[in-house]
């Protein structure tokens, strides 16, 4: 009977969720409006996602995530350019207010003008299949220049890979690795 009780609980939750979602969405819009009025640059249109491009506010996504973490708020994703927070009615109003207070308490600084490196132009040495099945090793990105990538290198799945299996790692790829915090990569032996 445990499974039936679980199904009953899930059905109750789903029946209640629509109402709680309809009540929660305007609160999220209010939070987004407060953040925008405070000077945060918000991007995207997903109603339950708060996506901040914080460089115009003087922080990297990683830096703003660290500040929010001090208040017990953990981002879904952050990198040098973005911070993403996933919101849900299950978080409750207290969490939204805690997030609002934490964001509005962050002191605005001079904008950060550093931008991400250009997107690499791939130079192929092997087909992806050949590269995947070739003997490989993991090395620091500082030693990867000129080597052939043995595995897709991405900062946070699901993301666009910086280098795909079979591509030659050039200076642009190395700069992107470093910018996005990738310290090691797989290369063909």
Regions found by a protein language model. Name each.
Residues 2-30:
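Structural signature of PLP-dependent enzymes
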Residues 124-189:
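C-terminal accessory/binding modules appended to enzymatic or scaffolding proteins
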């Amino acid at each position: 009977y445990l499974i039936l009780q679980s199904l009953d609980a899930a059905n109750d939750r789903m029946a209640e969720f629509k109402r709680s979602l309809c009540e929660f969405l305007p609160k999220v819009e209010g939070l987004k409006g407060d953040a925008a009025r405070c000077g945060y640059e918000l991007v995207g249109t997903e109603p339950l996602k708060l996506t901040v491009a914080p460089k115009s506010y003087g922080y990297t996504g990683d830096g703003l995530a660290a500040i929010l973490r001090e208040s017990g708020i953990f981002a879904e994703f952050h990198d040098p350019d973005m911070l993403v927070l996933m919101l849900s009615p299950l978080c409750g109003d207290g969490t939204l207010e805690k997030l609002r207070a934490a964001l509005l308490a962050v002191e605005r600084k001079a904008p950060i003008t550093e931008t991400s490196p250009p997107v690499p132009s791939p130079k192929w040495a092997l087909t992806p299949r050949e590269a995947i099945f070739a003997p490989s090793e993991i090395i620091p990105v500082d030693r990867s220049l000129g080597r052939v990538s043995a595995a897709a290198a991405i900062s946070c799945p699901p993301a666009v890979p910086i280098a795909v299996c079979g591509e030659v790692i050039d200076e642009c790829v190395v700069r992107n690795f470093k910018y996005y915090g990738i310290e090691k990569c797989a290369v063909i032996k």
